[in-house]
Amino acid sequence: MLSFSFIWATRPLRRCGQLVGMAVRCQHSEAAQTQTGEASKGWSGQESLSDSDPEMWELLRREKDRQCRGLELIASENFCSRAALEALGSCLNNKYSEGYPGKRYYGGAEVVDEIELLCQRRALEAFDLDPAQWGVNVQPYSGSPANLAAYTALLQPHDRIMGLDLPDGGHLTHGYMSDVKRISATSIFFESMPYKLNPQTGLIDYDQLALTARLFKPRLIIAGTSAYARLIDYARMREVCDEVKAHLLADMAHISGLVAAKVIPSPFKHADIVTTTTHKTLRGARSGLIFYRKGVQAVDPKTGREIPYTFEDRINFAVFPSLQGGPHNHAIAAVAVALKQACTPMFREYSLQILKNAQAMANALLERGYSLVSGGTDNHLVLVDLRPKGLDGARAERVLELVSITANKNTCPGDRSAITPGGLRLGAPALTSRGFLEDDFRKVVGFIDEGVNIGLEVKSKTTKLQDFKSFLLKDPETSHQLADLRQRVEQFARAFPMPGFDDH
């Protein structure tokens, strides 16, 4: 168990009528009950989910049980706090508020204005940003819309962008396209050129990136990853951007919690725009943020006139009204709660533990003979290359899923198939939120190794992926092996506490 305490809210929700100093809602008053009479037998909106929709309630309980008894290793997942979940499931879901604080297209927005401004302030505080030099838009629904909004603000249709290639650890929204098709909207609306890893080192090839940028002349270079286990050299990318007169956008979706905790380098010193999700290492509700530079960009050497940044109005207009309608006020409030948590010493301790756990996981895998892309990790994840073992990520993912270990198949450099890629991506944030330490992650690697060995045995007896999956379920000996491993995994996992609500 962790030596430090994860203080999640444990008190049960109180009904509105129990809140001291607040007016009792009219439908709870005696007069309202008298007026409604028999109508009270109709819809009131006060029924619990378990009473109103037992079928959905049972599905939620099953998912909660799956999370409690399993080992969650998907690098982009985490366990949100009860406090943030309470905000997410609040009355804020009811309020429509197109526009921005003080400039809404709907009335009754006084409170949500305060909530959005509070979220903005906390976002800047979480990353130690001067409000005179940085602003933030907290309305993006998630990371992909945040990226598209940033591109829309900075670029014209068919302008050129560069991002890390998806098989090398990039993200779909960084301009991904295959040899035969434009996959992401960011490659449909803009002309994209990927940069790649050095195949010998597994690290971003900055020299080749610079050479490609000189030839391609992009308007925007994206510094961000989804399956890259090393730190990004933002200073080097800034140099490239300055040389080719491109904007630098840092997508820190995976690492924003680590940046806020100051346990890895920050992109803010070098980037023009920074985007992020809020539910990964930041451990909040699902949403997105766009940070942008403001203030003085330069001084005209001839006239001495200050030249300001123009990102603020462009970013805000791109989010609304260009791409979105009303913001999700419940999500903004939940993000604000998580951002407050991210400013605490406890969160820094948590983030340091993520790095320790990821390192322990990487070392344990190497000791067992596994190959890791780039040879290790500097952040919250490891990318295992299973090809030297003779297995692929799709088969490994399915075996692990059957023993209550959740991971995801992932492309490795040189992969040609997204259906059966050679990699398996493993992340430390979620289990660290449950209190796992280094020794616990070493045990987790032991379970993974057992699962991979089962997969290798079954692969030797089958051909196609579908045959492999069917054999896992139908072969008695294999089923017995899986059941035994699953029982040990679940017994191990249930011993650790789970953030959030107790029953859903």
Curated annotation (Swiss-Prot):
Protein origin, superkingdom: Eukaryota
PTM remark: Succinylation at Lys-280 inhibits the hydroxymethyltransferase activity. Desuccinylation by SIRT5 restores the activity, leading to promote cell proliferation.
N6-succinyllysine modified-residue sites: 280
Entry keyword Nucleus: yes
Modified positions (N6-acetyllysine) in chain numbering: 103, 181, 196, 356, 464, 469, 474
A Pfam family of this chain: SHMT
Annotated pathway: One-carbon metabolism; tetrahydrofolate interconversion
Major location category of this protein: mitochondrion
SUPFAM superfamilies: PLP-dependent transferases
Enzyme Commission (EC) number: 2.1.2.1
UniProt entry keywords in alphabetical sequence: Acetylation, Cytoplasm, Membrane, Mitochondrion, Mitochondrion inner membrane, Mitochondrion nucleoid, Nucleus, One-carbon metabolism, Phosphoprotein, Pyridoxal phosphate, Transferase, Transit peptide
Catalytic activities: (6R)-5,10-methylene-5,6,7,8-tetrahydrofolate + glycine + H2O = (6S)-5,6,7,8-tetrahydrofolate + L-serine
Entry similarity comment: Belongs to the SHMT family.
Additional observations: In eukaryotes there are two forms of the enzymes: a cytosolic one and a mitochondrial one.
Cited function: Catalyzes the cleavage of serine to glycine accompanied with the production of 5,10-methylenetetrahydrofolate, an essential intermediate for purine biosynthesis. Serine provides the major source of folate one-carbon in cells by catalyzing the transfer of one carbon from serine to tetrahydrofolate. Contributes to the de novo mitochondrial thymidylate biosynthesis pathway via its role in glycine and tetrahydrofolate metabolism: thymidylate biosynthesis is required to prevent uracil accumulation in mtDNA.
Record protein name field: Serine hydroxymethyltransferase, mitochondrial
Organism: Bos taurus (Bovine)
